[in-house]
Amino acid sequence: VLSSADKNNVKACWGKIGSHAGEYGAEALERTFCSFPTTKTYFPHFDLSHGSAQVQTHGQKVADALTKAVAHINNLPNALSDLSDLHAYKLRVDPVNFKFLSHCLLVTLACHHPEEFTPAVHASLDKFFSAVSTVLTSKYR
């Protein structure tokens, strides 16, 4: 459960990301594909090379979804319902992949914002990404 401090930390951190959200989303995807090669199986039609336009575009989609989640942090299930349906019923993504991407998002954000990435912010973002992952996998049951 996200506390008020967690929500404030997430909103403050995401606010500092600003226009770099898509770039960081793509970087996190690249990290995920490199660190967890089985995740590539969901993107057989993508050019997964460094800096590819397809990875950049999908990274922006990830960032947009997270930006929406931050904006609706008090009602994640409603805000992410369509995305949950897509991943559960159409794409059938293995739920563990959300944990992999979450980890890579944390690494990416820590690399780009080391001063702001305090232990408290790290914990808050980890809880937030976990909450988002839980919502995205909630319709698998």
Curated annotation (Swiss-Prot):
Tissue specificity, in the record's words, reads: Red blood cells.
Q: Name one GO biological process term.
A: hydrogen peroxide catabolic process
Which keywords has UniProt assigned to this entry?
Acetylation, Heme, Iron, Metal-binding, Oxygen transport, Phosphoprotein, Transport
- Where N6-succinyllysine occurs, the residues are 7, 11, 16, 40
The molecular function GO annotations come to: haptoglobin binding; heme binding; metal ion binding; organic acid binding; oxygen binding; oxygen carrier activity; peroxidase activity
Q: Which residue positions does Phosphothreonine occur at?
A: 108, 134, 137
One GO cellular-component annotation of the UniProt record comes to: blood microparticle
Locate the residues binding O2.
58
Q: Which CDD domains match?
A: Hb-alpha-like
**Matches recorded under Gene3D superfamilies:** Globins (1.10.490.10)
Q: Which residues carry this modification: N6-acetyllysine?
A: 16
Residues given in the record as heme b binding sites = 87
Q: Does the keyword Membrane apply?
A: no
On this chain, the residues bearing Phosphoserine are 3, 35, 49, 102, 124, 138
* Presence of the UniProt keyword Disulfide bond in the record: no
**Family, similarity comment:** Belongs to the globin family.
Which PANTHER family does this entry report, sorted A to Z? HEMOGLOBIN FAMILY MEMBER (PTHR11442), HEMOGLOBIN SUBUNIT ALPHA (PTHR11442:SF48)
Under the subunit heading, UniProt states: Heterotetramer of two alpha chains and two beta chains.
Q: What function does the entry list?
A: Involved in oxygen transport from the lung to the various peripheral tissues.
**What is the protein named?**
Hemoglobin subunit alpha
This chain is encoded by the gene named HBA
